[in-house]
Amino acid sequence: MSEKEEAPSTSKSTGAPSRPTLSLPPRPFSEMFFNGGVGFSPGPMTLVSNMFPDSDEFRSFSQLLAGAMSSPATAAAAAAAATASDYQRLGEGTNSSSGDVDPRFKQNRPTGLMISQSQSPSMFTVPPGLSPAMLLDSPSFLGLFSPVQGSYGMTHQQALAQVTAQAVQANANMQPQTEYPPPSQVQSFSSGQAQIPTSAPLPAQRETSDVTIIEHRSQQPLNVDKPADDGYNWRKYGQKQVKGSEFPRSYYKCTNPGCPVKKKVERSLDGQVTEIIYKGQHNHEPPQNTKRGNKDNTANINGSSINNNRGSSELGASQFQTNSSNKTKREQHEAVSQATTTEHLSEASDGEEVGNGETDVREKDENEPDPKRRSTEVRISEPAPAASHRTVTEPRIIVQTTSEVDLLDDGYRWRKYGQKVVKGNPYPRSYYKCTTPGCGVRKHVERAATDPKAVVTTYEGKHNHDLPAAKSSSHAAAAAQLRPDNRPGGLANLNQQQQQQPVARLRLKEEQTT
């Protein structure tokens, strides 16, 4: 009874009203044993609970919640008075009436949970060793704080909110920062309200950068199947897969009615146009360009010319005008080069029609008496990339001999890749290609229409290698074996055999008739 009487006297001396008390069950022996025993390793919850004092002012979360819900006003005044008196008694160093105060009040408190006076009273930090989830699950988590507004200036609800906010902020800091503003800021910028946030100019910078990127991309060359423009309109009517190249050879025809000009486009292994072979001569002027020229290329892509309503439309118009100007320059360049080389072109016939997948598509257009090969080298320039063409006229050698054999031995090795019947000549024309790797020499062999015994061989190009090693040993052996037959004695024996064979046949016939 004396102890119960001392407690109210202490509270009366401090002038604070009485506070509600809860009777706690005694601790079991095992808990006391683990708390005070030697040689045992306590669990994590025991360690956390030992870090906080065991006085009545620092109870479990459920007890604090029950006390706050029962009488918040009374508990607030009592807790404030008790806390002030405890700090005063600890500061004076007196232990006369400190039965309710644990001397481990400040010694066992972890340094990570200490709140500095220089910081804001509503903020605290979580130590690195403890996660917010572990701290919330601890039964003595809110023992550091008063159940109501105390010396720390926050309730346990506010403490929970602070811990949750810090956990969310820590997770947000671990994620990579995005370069785009929140949707709310972008929406406020696009709505055009009077109050614009601080980060509102960021979408405007993004829009300007997008304009610059798109304009730069519009100047880059595109590697498409269509070759560089030469001032004329072409229609693709066939293609063929060439041995040794991943890209097929494309065949084009001029779209102008009555124009017989055709061309072939060959590409290298990397997809670049390496050779354009024209066939025939245009019988019309180059078509006029209907698109806008350089005079209309006055689109301004500055910030003053782009607004929120017409930014995309002006951007599309500027791209169209830029592409038109680049194409106009290329067409002018190609028209000049085409005009200087048209005198080397000859007329073409309509004897060749090539379709997709047909097997009669040959390596070369057959009705081409004087072809013109154009090797292209693509160079990228800074303002507007264009293809600079280099015209190469390969030498042609025509050899006419009288022979019964079409293919004459000239020392090189050839591979036949095509054959075609030419209009006006009943004899077919055969096409051959040099088998040496890297050599582009071709030849076609045909008999003259006026003299069937005359063989006309036309060579195109120049060999870039020496003569291959001829099979002289085999030819010499064959010639040596044939030399005895050429002697007069050999001819006499051959004549005798020829004379005897008809007699034998006559005898067989006579035997069959009898």
Swiss-Prot record:
Keywords: DNA-binding, Metal-binding, Nucleus, Plant defense, Repeat, Transcription, Transcription regulation, Zinc. Zn(2+) binds at C434, T436, C439, H463, H465. Pfam families: WRKY. One of its GO terms (biological process) is defense response. Residues 359-380 have a biased composition (Basic and acidic residues). Residues 223-287, 403-468 bind DNA. In young, mature and senescent leaves. Disruption phenotype: Increased sensitivity to the necrotrophic fungal pathogen Botrytis cinerea. This is Probable WRKY transcription factor 4. Transcription factor that binds specifically to the W box (5'-(T)TGAC[CT]-3'), a frequently occurring elicitor-responsive cis-acting element. Has a positive role in resistance to necrotrophic pathogens (e.g. Botrytis cinerea), but a negative effect on plant resistance to biotrophic pathogens (e.g. Pseudomonas syringae). Residues 185-198, 286-299, 315-326 have a biased composition (Polar residues).
